[in-house]
């Protein structure tokens, strides 16, 4: 865990060496990978297929940061999250962690996560943590969700490559990489949101891993690329609430 892969080297028909930046080498017949799909074609060696590398380099991401504020109130609002459409603020969504589970927060307190959709290196991403916390407090106050005096603590978490971008060339680039993997590297299994460059929720991501393991251990022929191909909006529910 927490190890960066330098190279995945194919040295026999279905045998690989996974070489870490630390210098450690692991030999494997099957490789399950959650590294960004964008990086996979340039990580697998040898790879003379330039088209796959260009497709990988063309895949784009949207980055993300969350400002978590601990409030001295028992419950700010009943929703799990609220999408913000107010043009006067930069926050895109507010999570209420205690509404997901009361065990996520201390008794009598509330923790709200203000989520900002950003790009690495832009103004918000580069802003100092204390200024981001001040911004979040002021925006919650502007939205009439809290009183400034109720804030006890603030934390900032930055998440690169949080969202795969679906641009006009998305399907073409994914198809090129998928075809290459399924024909030349059948024993490499990309999984998860980053690993497949697909807007998978947690359940979808777990399912791609489960199906990959079943393919390896039980010899099944599950196509993980068929997981989550429906076009329904993931957070939509029958009641219309999120």
Pin down the residues of each PLM region.
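Conserved active-site beta-strand element of glycosyltransferases/polysaccharide synthases
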Residues: 1
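Juxtacatalytic substrate-recognition/specificity segment
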Residues: 161
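Mid-domain catalytic core of redox enzymes
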Residues: 4-130, 134-145, 157, 171, ...
């Amino acid at each position: 865990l927490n190890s960066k892969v330098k190279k995945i080297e194919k040295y026999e028909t279905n045998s690989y060496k996974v070489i870490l930046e630390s210098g450690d080498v692991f030999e494997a017949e099957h490789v399950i990978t959650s590294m960004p799909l964008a990086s996979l074609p340039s990580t697998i060696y040898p790879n003379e297929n330039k088209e796959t590398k260009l497709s990988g380099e063309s895949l784009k991401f949207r980055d993300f940061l969350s400002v978590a504020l601990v409030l001295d109130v028992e419950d700010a609002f009943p929703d799990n999250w609220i999408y913000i459409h107010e043009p006067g603020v930069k926050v895109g969504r507010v999570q209420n962690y205690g509404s997901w589970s009361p065990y996520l927060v201390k008794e009598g307190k509330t923790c709200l996560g203000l989520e900002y959709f950003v790009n690495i290196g832009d103004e918000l991403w580069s802003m100092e943590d204390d200024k981001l916390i001040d911004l979040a407090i002021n925006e919650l106050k502007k939205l009439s969700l809290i009183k400034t005096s109720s804030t006890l603590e603030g934390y900032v978490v930055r998440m690169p490559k949080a969202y795969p971008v679906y641009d006009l060339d998305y399907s073409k680039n994914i198809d090129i990489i998928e075809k290459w993997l399924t024909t030349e590297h059948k024993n490499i299994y990309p999984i998860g949101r980053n690993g497949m460059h697909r807007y998978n929720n947690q359940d979808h991501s777990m399912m791609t891993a489960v199906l990959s393991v079943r393919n390896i251990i039980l010899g099944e022929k599950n196509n993980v690329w068929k997981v989550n191909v429906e076009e329904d909006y993931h957070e939509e529910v029958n009641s219309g609430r999120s």
